[in-house]
């Protein structure tokens, strides 16, 4: 576990792809448990350690997660997220450049929009993206800008 920032109110951790932030039906040990263990050991805390989950990242996503170390910090961060005061930025590394319907969108500075319809299968604990409208699905739009290329 990599701690990026820590003070008396929050702790920011670099979540790896494949980890879950909070417990779910899979029974896999969540990142929040590892952070609690870290805090308990570092500060020699007896008993339970408070740790508030302020937001989540999906299992396949790597990135920074902010946890609250106090209930007051959790309330403030929840309010900030609810009021849109927190701006999230996602960077994706793809094998091939994205293609817009006109065949553009792969050059640096260019971009586009990808639209999918999302469905969830609770029994499989999986979500699916469809490239066409599906009854009961939630429409999801992703606006992107290409920021670089690699020779790889």
Which residues are covered by each model-predicted region?
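RNA pseudouridine synthases
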Residues: 1-152
């Amino acid at each position: 576990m990599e701690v990026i920032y820590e003070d008396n109110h929050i702790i920011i951790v670099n979540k790896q792809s494949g980890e879950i932030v909070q417990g779910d039906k899979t029974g896999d040990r969540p990142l929040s448990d590892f952070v609690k263990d870290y805090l308990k050991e570092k500060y020699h805390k007896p008993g339970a350690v408070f740790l508030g989950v302020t937001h989540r990242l999906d299992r396949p996503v790597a990135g920074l997660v902010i946890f609250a170390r106090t209930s007051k910090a959790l309330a403030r961060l929840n309010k900030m997220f609810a009021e849109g005061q927190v701006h999230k930025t996602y960077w994706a590394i793809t094998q091939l450049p994205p293609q817009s319907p006109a065949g553009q969108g792969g050059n640096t500075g260019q971009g586009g929009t990808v639209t999918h319809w999302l469905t969830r299968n609770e029994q499989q604990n999986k979500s699916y993206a469809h490239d066409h409208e599906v009854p009961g699905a939630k429409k999801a739009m992703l606006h992107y800008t290409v920021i670089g290329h690699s020779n790889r």
